[in-house]
Amino acid sequence: MIKAIDTIVAQATAPGRGGVGIIRISGPDVEAVAKVILGKVPKLRFAEYLSFSDQHNEVLDQGIALFFKAPNSFTGEDVLELQGHGGPVVMDMLIKAILSIKNLRGANPGEFSERAFMNDKLDLAQAEGIADLIEATSEQAAKSALHSLQGEFSEKIEQLVESLIYLRIYVEASIDFPEEEVDFLSDGKISKGLYQIIDNLEAVKKQAKQGAILRDGMKVVIAGRPNAGKSSLLNSLVGVERAIVTDIAGTTRDVMREHIHIDGMPLHIIDTAGLREGADEIEKIGIERAWQEITTADRILFMLDATTTSAEDPRQIWPDFIDKLPKSVGLTVVRNKADLTGEAFSMTENHDHPVYRISAKTGQGVDLLKEHLKDIMGYQGHTTSGFMARRRHLEAIDNAQRHLLEGKVQLEEYKAGELLAEELRLTQQYLSEITGAFSSDDLLGKIFSSFCIGK
């Protein structure tokens, strides 16, 4: 347990008027605060209805007091919670009275959670789960954040780390005892253990990607030539008319963004200017911005006017566009105006690209497209949600995976035990960054400073 010098105080409930306002105090001088504000130290883990007074015994409010003794508290320190009336003036008066006591100061953003982390009450991924639960914008995201808070993500990472430690011991034993008759590097046990870790890490990576989408949303860019129906599709997905729609090519000249949820799954839908040569200066700027969005998208909805072509292969339709796309960006072909061509509103696969036939104007086939977007995001319906993940988690997993695969090369091609051991060590180091078992002070400061004050 890390011993704190300061005792900190902050309002734990949101600022503003409310029926109840909660003030949280944590640190070594909590009992001194209780004696001043309450006139006594409350009974441990027992709700007492008391008056809240200042140092001059003037009553400021009355409510419930809860006292938790270290280490049995959220922060692992002595903690006092005062639950009073939620008016901003009352809260401010009470906090000022508490701050007038020696060794008290206002808490920094996320400092209560940081102290909980430092005192091993929760790991870094769980601490981030608190912030993600508070900031969740959908039911699915809230459930996933709760699973992270409850340690589901951390447990998977710890299982991987334990497997790595066991494998490292075996590899390093083969290095330290070369005189043994058994060739540890060739007996199959190391390769079997390594392949199992590679498979398990890939499974966790897939879940983490879904968790990151739940937290940050999936960026879907609608792109195509002018007058293909891009703005009509945006309006249909959003459910209201956000974009101006006309028969004039080039009506959309700038990027338009809308944030929507499809069954709790967050999407950032981006409508872009029609891509063409020979546009005027204003439209050219819009096209440049469109390409900026396209290259950073998670998914491209490639819009076609079905009345102008029967082709479905995007490379056949517009090879230059496909060549400019980053390989990491997924593509879905959308044949719009199928109501005019008589095509069935359906989906087929063509050269690894799904093709959807819709009418953005009438909305026919759009529900099928929505189901497609949900599937891409890993929608799980009413089944148990996965865990929440952040971009730093994905980066750590990517780095760990890179070193793990390099270790596989060292084992299979070179039988280099020392280099394999080093790659396993680096893999473990990156995975341990996720839970905070191995993290720099700069990283911790950046993470906790993004939390709410009082958390």
UniProtKB/Swiss-Prot annotation:
Exhibits a very high intrinsic GTPase hydrolysis rate. Involved in the addition of a carboxymethylaminomethyl (cmnm) group at the wobble position (U34) of certain tRNAs, forming tRNA-cmnm(5)s(2)U34. This is tRNA modification GTPase MnmE. (6S)-5-formyl-5,6,7,8-tetrahydrofolate binds at R24, E81, K121, K455. Homodimer. Heterotetramer of two MnmE and two MnmG subunits. Its cofactor is K(+). Binds 1 potassium ion per subunit. GO terms for molecular function: GTP binding; GTPase activity; metal ion binding. InterPro entries: G_TrmE, GTP-bd, GTP-bd_TrmE_N, GTPase_MnmE, MnmE_dom2, MnmE_helical, P-loop_NTPase, Small_GTP-bd. Residues 217-378 form the TrmE-type G domain. The gene is mnmE. Its EC number is 3.6.-.-. Mg(2+) binds at S231, T252. The keyword Transmembrane helix does not apply. It comes from Psychromonas ingrahamii (strain DSM 17664 / CCUG 51855 / 37). Belongs to the TRAFAC class TrmE-Era-EngA-EngB-Septin-like GTPase superfamily. TrmE GTPase family. It is an enzyme of class 3 (hydrolase). The keyword Cytoplasm applies.
